[in-house]
Amino acid sequence: MDLRAKPASTCSNYTLLLPRLVLEVSKNDKICVACNSPDFVNSNGNLNVKDLEAHAKARLHSSHFAGFVLCPIVASEDKVSTFDMYYHVIQERTVLYRPQNTVLTEMCCIISALENCVVPSASLLIQYLDRANQLFNRHPSRDSLFLLGGVKTLISTLMHWHGFQHPDVSQLPRGLQSYELYKDLESFDAECKDLMLSMFCKSFKLGDWNEENEQLEAFTFNLFYSPTILTKHFKSKIIISSIKEACLLKDCVLSLI
Protein backbone atom coordinates (compact mmCIF):
# COMPACT_ATOMS: atom_id res chain seq x y z
CA MET A 1 0.00 0.00 0.00
CA ASP A 2 1.32 3.41 -0.97
CA LEU A 3 0.94 5.47 2.20
CA ARG A 4 1.95 8.64 0.37
CA ALA A 5 -0.99 8.39 -2.01
CA LYS A 6 -3.99 8.85 0.27
CA PRO A 7 -3.70 9.48 4.03
CA ALA A 8 -5.98 7.05 5.85
CA SER A 9 -6.91 9.56 8.54
CA THR A 10 -8.03 12.34 6.20
CA CYS A 11 -11.12 12.95 4.11
CA SER A 12 -10.86 15.60 1.38
CA ASN A 13 -9.08 18.44 3.18
CA TYR A 14 -10.12 17.56 6.72
CA THR A 15 -8.38 15.32 9.22
CA LEU A 16 -10.83 12.92 10.84
CA LEU A 17 -8.59 11.36 13.50
CA LEU A 18 -5.64 12.80 15.36
CA PRO A 19 -3.62 12.33 18.57
CA ARG A 20 -4.12 14.91 21.32
CA LEU A 21 -2.61 15.81 24.70
CA VAL A 22 0.75 14.23 23.93
CA LEU A 23 3.18 14.20 26.86
CA GLU A 24 6.49 12.47 27.52
CA VAL A 25 6.30 9.98 30.38
CA SER A 26 9.22 9.07 32.64
CA LYS A 27 9.17 6.55 35.47
CA ASN A 28 11.51 5.79 38.35
CA ASP A 29 10.23 3.25 40.89
CA LYS A 30 6.98 4.70 42.28
CA ILE A 31 7.48 8.14 40.75
CA CYS A 32 5.96 9.03 37.38
CA VAL A 33 6.24 12.34 35.53
CA ALA A 34 4.32 13.36 32.41
CA CYS A 35 5.53 16.56 30.76
CA ASN A 36 5.49 18.36 27.45
CA SER A 37 8.37 18.14 25.02
CA PRO A 38 10.61 21.23 24.72
CA ASP A 39 10.01 23.41 21.66
CA PHE A 40 13.72 23.56 20.68
CA VAL A 41 13.44 27.11 19.39
CA ASN A 42 16.75 28.96 19.13
CA SER A 43 17.42 32.62 19.88
CA ASN A 44 16.38 33.57 16.34
CA GLY A 45 12.97 31.95 16.73
CA ASN A 46 13.82 29.02 14.46
CA LEU A 47 13.50 25.30 15.10
CA ASN A 48 16.76 23.66 16.16
CA VAL A 49 16.36 20.36 14.31
CA LYS A 50 19.65 18.95 15.55
CA ASP A 51 18.65 19.36 19.21
CA LEU A 52 15.15 18.02 18.53
CA GLU A 53 16.59 14.91 16.89
CA ALA A 54 19.12 14.43 19.69
CA HIS A 55 16.37 14.75 22.30
CA ALA A 56 14.24 12.11 20.57
CA LYS A 57 17.16 9.69 20.43
CA ALA A 58 18.02 10.31 24.09
CA ARG A 59 14.41 9.76 25.16
CA LEU A 60 14.09 6.54 23.19
CA HIS A 61 17.21 5.06 24.76
CA SER A 62 16.63 6.29 28.32
CA SER A 63 15.93 3.59 30.90
CA HIS A 64 13.40 5.91 32.59
CA PHE A 65 11.46 6.74 29.42
CA ALA A 66 8.10 4.93 29.42
CA GLY A 67 6.68 6.45 26.24
CA PHE A 68 4.13 9.11 25.35
CA VAL A 69 0.69 9.36 26.86
CA LEU A 70 -1.88 10.52 24.31
CA CYS A 71 -5.55 10.32 23.43
CA PRO A 72 -6.64 9.60 19.84
CA ILE A 73 -9.79 11.59 19.08
CA VAL A 74 -12.23 12.30 16.29
CA ALA A 75 -11.69 15.93 15.29
CA SER A 76 -15.26 16.91 16.14
CA GLU A 77 -14.81 15.65 19.72
CA ASP A 78 -12.37 18.44 20.62
CA LYS A 79 -14.37 21.21 22.31
CA VAL A 80 -11.38 23.46 23.19
CA SER A 81 -11.43 22.85 26.95
CA THR A 82 -12.87 19.34 27.03
CA PHE A 83 -13.65 16.32 24.86
CA ASP A 84 -17.15 15.43 23.74
CA MET A 85 -17.02 11.83 24.92
CA TYR A 86 -18.05 9.81 27.93
CA TYR A 87 -15.53 9.04 30.66
CA HIS A 88 -15.33 5.32 29.89
CA VAL A 89 -14.51 6.23 26.26
CA ILE A 90 -11.66 8.60 27.08
CA GLN A 91 -10.47 6.09 29.67
CA GLU A 92 -10.25 3.38 27.01
CA ARG A 93 -8.71 5.60 24.34
CA THR A 94 -5.97 7.21 26.41
CA VAL A 95 -2.84 5.10 25.93
CA LEU A 96 0.81 4.95 26.82
CA TYR A 97 2.53 4.71 23.44
CA ARG A 98 6.10 3.41 23.14
CA PRO A 99 7.49 4.33 19.69
CA GLN A 100 9.82 1.77 18.19
CA ASN A 101 12.13 4.15 16.36
CA THR A 102 13.47 7.69 16.53
CA VAL A 103 11.27 8.92 13.67
CA LEU A 104 8.05 8.15 15.55
CA THR A 105 9.56 9.45 18.78
CA GLU A 106 10.49 12.75 17.16
CA MET A 107 7.05 13.11 15.57
CA CYS A 108 5.45 12.67 19.00
CA CYS A 109 7.82 15.33 20.35
CA ILE A 110 6.73 17.70 17.58
CA ILE A 111 3.04 17.26 18.43
CA SER A 112 3.71 17.82 22.13
CA ALA A 113 5.78 20.91 21.35
CA LEU A 114 3.05 22.30 19.08
CA GLU A 115 0.35 21.82 21.70
CA ASN A 116 2.49 23.58 24.30
CA CYS A 117 3.98 26.32 22.11
CA VAL A 118 3.31 29.57 23.99
CA VAL A 119 4.61 32.04 21.40
CA PRO A 120 4.48 30.48 17.93
CA SER A 121 5.22 32.20 14.65
CA ALA A 122 4.19 31.35 11.11
CA SER A 123 7.75 30.51 10.10
CA LEU A 124 8.27 28.29 13.16
CA LEU A 125 5.07 26.35 12.49
CA ILE A 126 6.09 25.77 8.87
CA GLN A 127 9.50 24.55 10.07
CA TYR A 128 7.74 22.00 12.29
CA LEU A 129 5.65 20.99 9.28
CA ASP A 130 8.69 20.58 7.04
CA ARG A 131 10.44 18.47 9.65
CA ALA A 132 7.38 16.25 10.13
CA ASN A 133 7.11 15.71 6.37
CA GLN A 134 10.80 14.79 6.23
CA LEU A 135 10.34 12.27 9.02
CA PHE A 136 7.32 10.68 7.36
CA ASN A 137 9.13 10.37 4.03
CA ARG A 138 12.03 8.74 5.84
CA HIS A 139 9.80 6.18 7.56
CA PRO A 140 6.32 5.92 5.98
CA SER A 141 4.05 3.76 8.11
CA ARG A 142 0.53 3.77 9.51
CA ASP A 143 1.70 5.33 12.76
CA SER A 144 3.81 8.03 11.11
CA LEU A 145 0.89 8.84 8.79
CA PHE A 146 -1.44 9.18 11.77
CA LEU A 147 1.04 11.40 13.60
CA LEU A 148 1.66 13.52 10.49
CA GLY A 149 -2.07 14.13 10.17
CA GLY A 150 -2.06 15.36 13.76
CA VAL A 151 0.87 17.69 13.12
CA LYS A 152 -0.81 19.21 10.07
CA THR A 153 -4.16 19.70 11.77
CA LEU A 154 -2.65 21.33 14.86
CA ILE A 155 -0.50 23.64 12.74
CA SER A 156 -3.54 24.62 10.67
CA THR A 157 -5.48 25.27 13.89
CA LEU A 158 -2.70 27.45 15.30
CA MET A 159 -2.29 29.33 12.01
CA HIS A 160 -5.96 30.31 12.07
CA TRP A 161 -6.04 31.03 15.79
CA HIS A 162 -3.11 33.46 15.63
CA GLY A 163 -4.12 34.94 12.28
CA PHE A 164 -0.91 33.86 10.54
CA GLN A 165 -0.54 33.90 6.76
CA HIS A 166 1.89 31.70 4.84
CA PRO A 167 1.95 30.26 1.29
CA ASP A 168 2.37 26.70 2.61
CA VAL A 169 -0.96 26.86 4.48
CA SER A 170 -2.70 25.74 1.28
CA GLN A 171 -1.24 22.25 1.66
CA LEU A 172 -2.70 21.84 5.15
CA PRO A 173 -6.02 20.24 6.05
CA ARG A 174 -8.61 22.39 7.77
CA GLY A 175 -7.90 23.03 11.44
CA LEU A 176 -10.12 21.98 14.32
CA GLN A 177 -13.43 23.73 13.72
CA SER A 178 -14.34 24.25 17.36
CA TYR A 179 -11.33 26.58 17.69
CA GLU A 180 -12.50 28.61 14.70
CA LEU A 181 -15.89 29.06 16.37
CA TYR A 182 -14.32 29.74 19.77
CA LYS A 183 -12.20 32.53 18.28
CA ASP A 184 -15.15 34.06 16.45
CA LEU A 185 -17.17 34.10 19.67
CA GLU A 186 -14.53 36.25 21.37
CA SER A 187 -16.08 39.31 19.69
CA PHE A 188 -19.61 38.54 20.95
CA ASP A 189 -21.16 40.24 23.96
CA ALA A 190 -20.83 38.28 27.21
CA GLU A 191 -24.39 36.95 27.43
CA CYS A 192 -24.53 35.78 23.83
CA LYS A 193 -21.00 34.40 24.01
CA ASP A 194 -21.79 32.24 27.06
CA LEU A 195 -24.90 30.86 25.38
CA MET A 196 -23.07 30.01 22.16
CA LEU A 197 -20.14 28.46 24.02
CA SER A 198 -22.55 26.30 25.97
CA MET A 199 -24.17 25.14 22.74
CA PHE A 200 -21.09 24.48 20.62
CA CYS A 201 -17.92 24.36 22.76
CA LYS A 202 -18.96 22.42 25.85
CA SER A 203 -19.70 18.79 26.59
CA PHE A 204 -21.78 17.32 29.37
CA LYS A 205 -20.74 13.72 28.74
CA LEU A 206 -17.78 13.62 31.13
CA GLY A 207 -20.05 13.58 34.14
CA ASP A 208 -20.05 9.99 35.37
CA TRP A 209 -16.57 10.02 36.87
CA ASN A 210 -16.17 8.53 40.35
CA GLU A 211 -13.22 8.62 42.71
CA GLU A 212 -9.76 7.63 41.51
CA ASN A 213 -8.63 4.02 41.38
CA GLU A 214 -7.15 3.03 44.74
CA GLN A 215 -4.22 1.41 42.92
CA LEU A 216 -3.02 4.88 41.95
CA GLU A 217 -2.46 5.91 45.55
CA ALA A 218 0.76 3.89 45.69
CA PHE A 219 2.39 6.19 43.10
CA THR A 220 3.58 9.78 43.00
CA PHE A 221 2.37 11.35 39.77
CA ASN A 222 3.22 14.80 38.42
CA LEU A 223 2.02 16.41 35.21
CA PHE A 224 3.58 19.48 33.62
CA TYR A 225 2.42 21.47 30.61
CA SER A 226 2.44 24.99 29.19
CA PRO A 227 -0.90 26.86 29.24
CA THR A 228 -1.94 27.41 25.61
CA ILE A 229 -5.16 27.33 23.63
CA LEU A 230 -4.48 23.64 22.87
CA THR A 231 -3.88 22.56 26.48
CA LYS A 232 -7.01 23.84 28.22
CA HIS A 233 -8.08 20.21 28.62
CA PHE A 234 -5.49 19.69 31.36
CA LYS A 235 -7.66 21.77 33.69
CA SER A 236 -10.23 18.96 33.67
CA LYS A 237 -9.84 16.58 36.62
CA ILE A 238 -11.57 13.85 34.64
CA ILE A 239 -9.12 14.09 31.75
CA ILE A 240 -6.18 14.21 34.15
CA SER A 241 -7.54 11.08 35.83
CA SER A 242 -7.59 9.16 32.53
CA ILE A 243 -4.04 10.30 31.75
CA LYS A 244 -2.82 9.30 35.19
CA GLU A 245 -4.41 5.87 34.92
CA ALA A 246 -2.87 5.28 31.48
CA CYS A 247 0.59 6.29 32.72
CA LEU A 248 0.51 4.22 35.90
CA LEU A 249 -1.66 1.18 35.23
CA LYS A 250 -1.79 0.46 31.51
CA ASP A 251 0.74 -1.57 29.57
CA CYS A 252 2.37 0.45 26.81
CA VAL A 253 1.23 -0.08 23.23
CA LEU A 254 3.78 -0.41 20.43
CA SER A 255 1.55 0.85 17.63
CA LEU A 256 -1.35 3.29 17.34
CA ILE A 257 -2.93 2.03 14.12
From Swiss-Prot:
A single Gene Ontology CC term: host cell Golgi apparatus
Localisation: Virion; Virion tegument; Host cytoplasm; Host Golgi apparatus
Segments crossing the lipid bilayer: none
Keywords from the UniProt entry: Host cytoplasm, Host Golgi apparatus, Virion, Virion tegument
Homology family: Belongs to the herpesviridae cytoplasmic envelopment protein 1 family.
Function of the molecule: Plays a critical role in cytoplasmic virus egress. Participates in the final step of tegumentation and envelope acquisition within the host cytoplasm.
Protein known as: Cytoplasmic envelopment protein 1
Gene name linked to the record: 42
